Amino acid sequence: MQEGSKVTVRSPAGSGEAAVAFARRRWALLAAATAVFGGLYLRIFTAPPPAGFASPKAAPSAVSSAKAFYRPQLLPNSTARSVHSATAVEISGGRLRAFWFGGSREGASDVAIYPSVFSPPERTWSPERVLVTRESVQRTLQRYVRKLGNPAVGRDRSGRLWLFFVSVSVGGWAGSAVNLMVSEDEGETWSPPRRLVASPFFNISTLVKGPPLQFADGTIGLPVYHEMAGKFGELLRLDGEGHAIRKTRLSWGQSSLQPVIVPRSETDAVGFMRYAGDPPNRILVVRTSDAGAHWSAPVKMELPNPNAAIGSVLLSDGSLLLVFNNAPENREDLSLAISKDFGNTWRIAHRFEGDPGSPRAQVSEYSYPWIMQDQAADIHVLYTWGRSRIKHAHFNTAWLEGRR
């Protein structure tokens, strides 16, 4: 080498300018992720509390039929071998539109969401059809979907139907997410499903079962629950586009699931939850007096709960109804209880299933009730009948008066 000649020293791969550029990109990505997750955290956990629950519905203008009736019926046979977890909403003409999931078994890859419509004058349900499949959700979300689960339907203030349902991409139900579809034509057509962001971190382990509710400002309250690293309930508040803006804990620990929330005024509501802990097995109850901003600690009721879902509705006359499995260890007895003091005391009014002389399903399980009152003041209960059929009990307040 000649004296004074120029020597170029090259930096090893991964060092120097390349390393600096890589580090800058890494920090930029980290900052972006922090901003996104931080924004989601602030949006979900720091939104102001709502002004109040939407005012409870007024008494229907048409009083429930004077002649008492109670009409139970099984929905038409499903093409799915196993069906479960019905939900329903009233649509135009006094009809009901119901949804449930069905497949070869719960959790199977062939499970789909099925709808059907009930016509009160004809007392008939339409043939089911497939609305949502694992494959259709997977295509729309552009992510792997392993299975589908519970649906829950409700209305927003503008009259649109909101259909929530559970999907799982990895693992069991603890790895669930909640999806939303919206209909502006009473359920004839639906928007593509969209995955709700219910948590800023990973966004998994959120499930739904109970009916959505309305707040006075037009936002939606969605009772949800979690099964990963605990079993507890929450109230998720969504804006008019279905984005989470606030989340409030209903319970803590390892033993509470599937909350059902029933408001009775702009500030007061009661919530019931499935109990999955140590005996004694009892329904859990929580209460709020500030429109869901804070909730009392869960307390066990006197009514039993064999680790099973519950249904509840406040009637237009102020009575509170509860549908539940009236046994601590199994789902063979499905009963109706009524309270005149907003859940402080209860009386059993009827047994839907469990009488020795009543027809029995091959699998003695009667579970996952959904109860609602329509604009004619009639009451509807849908539930899983032996995991093979959905059953519908339709009755009026005159029949209920005879059971009080």
Show where each model-derived region lies.
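Asp-box/BNR beta-propeller blade signature and adjacent active/binding-site loops
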Residues: E3, V9-R404
